[in-house]
Design a protein with these regions (language model features):
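N-proximal low-complexity "stem/linker" segments adjacent to membrane-targeting elements
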Residues: 1-27
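Acidic helix N-cap motif at the loop->helix transition within catalytic regions
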Residues: 22, 48-57
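Short, acidic, metal-binding catalytic loop of nucleotide-sugar glycosyltransferases
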Residues: 26-36
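Short beta-strand/loop segment that forms part of the nucleotide-sugar
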Residues: 36-45, 67-69
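A conserved acidic beta->alpha catalytic loop
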Residues: 43-52, 102-103
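Long helical/loop segments within the catalytic core of UDP-sugar-dependent glycosyltransferases
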Residues: 61-82, 86, 112-185
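Short aromatic/hydrophobic "clamp" motif used to bind/position activated sugar donors
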Residues: 95
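Catalytic donor-sugar/metal-binding loop of nucleotide-sugar-dependent glycosyltransferases
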Residues: 164, 199-218
């Protein structure tokens, strides 16, 4: 598939994030990308105004689709299930997993991704940098498993850090074909021991510190 035909389904999940939806979601919806794309938001049974905000935005953006995850089932990993629903609802071959708080800072981010993505990579991790984005391709899903298991692990509270995100593997989005998305989701919300987590952190740090030449840094307008 040529870059002129590549279309993306951007998928995110939200829970009680009405304010972030109002502030950040328009930036995802206002991408200037000629082939076309869609944004899919899966609401994890929010108790705030998230549903109302999504309904209002749908009136203005026909490429926004939202769906609702039923009430909690303690035996089910809700975030993983929410992304599964998003993938099933998607209509395009290329999938991007992200978070509403990871607002794109330019309107040409999708164009930059499409123009520079490695078609031979099974998945690509994306990092927001000061003047654009950095893409980190992986030949197989397994090669990226430590990165994904660490960032998407089960946590009661996630601390946001701003510095050295690439070096520590704190990516902002994942790009992959649809048939790889389910394999990626198998790495979400795992329980990892502190000892194993420390080993993963050190592995990612040294790999990314000395592997910068394997990435592409893109400066957007």
């Amino acid at each position: 598939m040529s870059k002129n035909e590549r279309r993306f389904s951007i998928i995110m999940t939200v829970y009680d994030q009405a304010g972030e939806l109002e502030e950040n979601l328009p930036a995802f919806l206002q991408q200037e990308y000629e082939p076309g794309y869609e944004v899919i938001v899966v609401d994890e049974s929010s108790t705030d105004r998230s549903g109302d905000v999504l309904k209002l935005l749908r009136n203005n953006y026909p490429h926004l689709y939202s769906t609702f995850l039923p009430k909690p089932n303690r035996l089910v990993s809700r975030r993983k299930l929410a992304f599964h629903l998003g993938v099933k609802a998607s209509k395009y071959e290329w999938i991007i997993f992200t978070k509403v708080e990871r607002k794109p800072e330019a309107t040409d981010i999708l164009t930059a991704i499409s123009d520079n993505i490695d078609d031979d990579a099974e998945l690509t991790l994306g990092y927001s940098v000061k003047k654009g984005i950095r893409l980190q391709p992986f030949s197989t899903c397994g090669e990226a498993s430590n990165h994904i298991r660490r960032i998407e692990r089960k946590l009661s509270k996630v601390r946001e850090r701003k510095r050295m995100n690439y070096t520590w593997g704190r990516y902002d989005f994942i790009v992959m074909r649809k048939d790889v998305a389910y394999e990626v989701l198998n790495l979400f919300e795992q329980n990892i021991s502190p000892t194993k987590m420390l080993a993963i952190r050190h592995h990612i740090f040294w790999k990314n510190l000395f592997g910068r030449s394997a990435t592409t840094k893109l400066v957007t307008q």
